Amino acid sequence: MSKLRKKYLEHLLCVLIFFTYVIGYGEAQSKSFLVDCGSNATTEVDGRTWVGDLSPNKSVTLQGFDAITASTSKGSSVYAEIYKTARVFDAVLNYTFEGITQGNYFVRLHFSPFAIENHNVNESSFSVFADGLRLMLDINIAGEIAHKNLILESTGHNATASSLVKEFLLPTGPGKLVLSFIPEKGSFGFVNAIEIVSVDDKLFKESVTKVGGSEVELGLGGRGIETMYRLNVGGPKLGPSKDLKLYRTWETDLSYMVIENAGVEVKNSSNITYALADDSPVAPLLVYETARMMSNTEVLEKRFNISWKFEVDPNFDYLVRLHFCELLVDKQNQRIFRIYINNQTAAGNFDIFAHAGGKNKGIYQDYLDPVSSKNDVLWIQLGPDSSVGASGDALLSGLEIFKLSKNGNLAHLIRFDSTGHSVSDSKMRIIWISVGAGIAIIIFFVFLGILVVCLCKKRRSKSDESKNNPPGWRPLFLHVNNSTANAKATGGSLRLNTLAASTMGRKFTLAEIRAATKNFDDGLAIGVGGFGKVYRGELEDGTLIAIKRATPHSQQGLAEFETEIVMLSRLRHRHLVSLIGFCDEHNEMILVYEYMANGTLRSHLFGSNLPPLSWKQRLEACIGSARGLHYLHTGSERGIIHRDVKTTNILLDENFVAKMSDFGLSKAGPSMDHTHVSTAVKGSFGYLDPEYFRRQQLTEKSDVYSFGVVLFEAVCARAVINPTLPKDQINLAEWALSWQKQRNLESIIDSNLRGNYSPESLEKYGEIAEKCLADEGKNRPMMGEVLWSLEYVLQIHEAWLRKQNGENSFSSSQAVEEAPESFTLPACSNQDSSETEQSQTGSALHNSA
């Protein structure tokens, strides 16, 4: 009897367990709602059952007037079946979802425009609210899709989007959830499908790291979230069926990369796990099986980073979630990198292996970034941390960007028309087309009148040299103030010849220029650039000059030409190439400089048959160019940033005095209340400041970085980028820096220097170059400090030379002992200060050679 009772109790227990499971499963299922709008049937899509909103359903009720259904046979996406119908409304429409338990829910709204009888989907406009939270405002679905395709086209990808899914995360109390669709007055709206999916509370943490700051509380209990982007970095697109917990879609990252070949895809599908078991809802393991890491073969400047660029709505807070999984290295300190979000350092010294506790373990990091009202772009960038000894590489597996609600709003204020352009832009285009047409008519008649006058003048007068005039050149206007170098520009437009009496020096005739260059003989060409050619010339009195003749058709060259004129008309210094004069006859644009007899510094280092420079000559050349740069940075109120410091822009005169040249890319420094100048990245590969490249923020420290590359180039005598060398030697800055950090720079110096330099001077020289190449500008010295240090290095070397020659009046060890621990440098040396004063008073140009 006891056995029978025991068996009975076992059966009863099994039945209770079964019913407990069924009830629990039913409650879990009741948390999710899948609605096929405009349909009266149930449809199986992505392994889930979607119920038509016309089917009897106590959990979902539909309230609204004049709501109609529409259907189509089109569709090829995973959701094609539920996109065949839609709910169309021209009055307020409410969907009420009953039986909601307290917690967080993904609300996904599906839109797929198609032809609807008596309605033009291109003109639909409506708003959506969820329990008082505004999700969308006067949205035009066709315009949103067209705008997405425009972005894809701009990045060179196929524009194939035909539908739109808006995903929101909403904190909801127990009871019900009401979604309200409100058409704009006189318009209508539509929706194809709605899904409400319960979300684990562990998906988002309340406390996150603010970019550039400390831990902050998100306050998610009272805020809604919109998913802006969700990417499977380095891997294929993952549809909802690949993310069975939350049925999310993970796009590929290629269309958002700034430079696609900056990163390569890596994959490892074996034994991938979560670092923490609770992280399973965060992302499917498939996301962690692939990644993108920095490319060593396609990107010459390995210090640069992988960058992704995203269009966002201004004036919102954004939660950036980055997914990582170390797939290759098998111990700590092998891959260490930095994370940058919108030009700020979010994390430094980031080691995936250390954070995850091993290889093949998926982790994620959250960062909060407030985007200002003036910014509509969010940058995500990863780059190696040069301050540590790990490999120069970075890796990312996944990326998500979430917008946080502000004052009960998630809707963006920018509206797009059916072409994908903002409504304000469309209106302005119509206005400008009308205005442009009127202006074109006026210009036509003005041009016609000018043409008649010119033809009449041509009949009366012919120029002997008209046959040599270059075509297509436009007059050059300058915006400069010719009173003092420190005075602010007035913005007045001055033609070149109006500057002759002030800062531009002598005005040459075209006949004089032709005579000096033997009619622009190519045999006298000594340089060429985007602006045109540079010729060696000789005046009647035997004075040698350099003549820069601009190419009429080069707009880029023209802009640089104008910049150089503005800069040189304000600058006078012994270590800057001097402007002698100009010529603007017959629409020519010609500048005349002092002739630098010994050419570029690079030509004396490698690539020519010229005799190599001694160590002392190289130091003196570096000191001279440093003096010129120091003057640029400090010689005026805002200073000037050269932006193209390299050995081909350092010229040597007949006495090997070094002078900076080529100011076509130069930029005025930041004003007193700013720390940098925001500008597009320009410069020469191999010399570019990586921080400037990442943030597009220019400072004088960018010149310091480039000068650090010059220092290594001067001592190693090789190209800064040489793709024919082994990978670790391609980039001179990285290669030399690695040897310098080992305190073994002498192993890679120019063989012509061996035995002819002071070891102590080389050691100090290497330390200066290393400081110049610090990854962050704030850790680099000022150019004045670099100048002082180089002068000190020269003293050490000269003391060594005297000792070698038997002169013991001053030893290199004494020089080391006398060096101060810290130092400051006045704005200019005595010799240069007089030149600065002369520049500021706008006195006549003199030849400083």
UniProtKB/Swiss-Prot annotation:
Extracellular side: 29-429
Protein kinase domain location: 520-793
Entry's EC annotation: 2.7.11.-
Domain of life: Eukaryota
Polar residues bias locations: 827-849
PANTHER family: LEUCINE-RICH REPEAT-CONTAINING PROTEIN DDB_G0281931-RELATED, REPEAT TRANSMEMBRANE PROTEIN KINASE, PUTATIVE, EXPRESSED-RELATED
Name the UniProt record assigns to this protein: Probable receptor-like protein kinase At1g30570
Organism encoding this protein: Arabidopsis thaliana (Mouse-ear cress)
